[in-house]
Amino acid sequence: MNFYILTLFPDMVMNGLKSSITGRAISKGIINAEAVDIRDYTLDRDRRVDDYPYGGGAGMLMEAQPVYDAYKAVIGMMKNVENIDYKNCRRPRVVYMTPKGKTFDQKMAQELAGEESLIFLCGHYEGIDERVIDEIVTDRVSIGDYVLTGGELPAMVMID
């Protein structure tokens, strides 16, 4: 199984995943995990990924452009690594980690385990520009009725 994690903190994700049993599964090639740094896809020289919400409101959102470009890069990686022709099959599932999502449980874990690949989208700030969520996300998932600083820990929980 292949996991692609779109994140602002790739080192945090990979250090967590390379520990314990998950780390052994990665080193033996049983699973593959790639953390993709969304900042690598920003057009801003300062690598900023946040902006004010369109129409106003409190807080900052992750911008659509770097998130979408990171997603497109992962699709490109998947074509190369997995040798899949995505024109003739359904697109991979993209799991957006959000406290507003469906609660992750054993039934969902078994369902997702049947996928060849999963892309996890880890948000920060007040969330991600809704336009990119509407375009690429297939599943909105929460690991519980509480708020965390980002989606990295929930993604690691689900991968584990």
Model regions and ranges:
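Short, well-ordered secondary-structure micro-motifs
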Residues: 46, 106-108, 131-133
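Fold-independent oxyanion-binding glycine-rich loops
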Residues: 8, 38, 97-100, 122-124, ...
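S-adenosyl-L-methionine/SAH cofactor-binding core of RNA-modifying enzymes
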Residues: 63-119, 124
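Structured adenosyl-cofactor binding patch, chiefly the S-adenosyl-L-methionine
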Residues: 128, 132-160
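N-terminal nucleotide/polyanion-binding subdomain common to many enzyme families
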Residues: 1-82, 86
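Short, solvent-exposed amphipathic alpha-helical segments in soluble enzyme
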Residues: 20-24, 110-114, 136
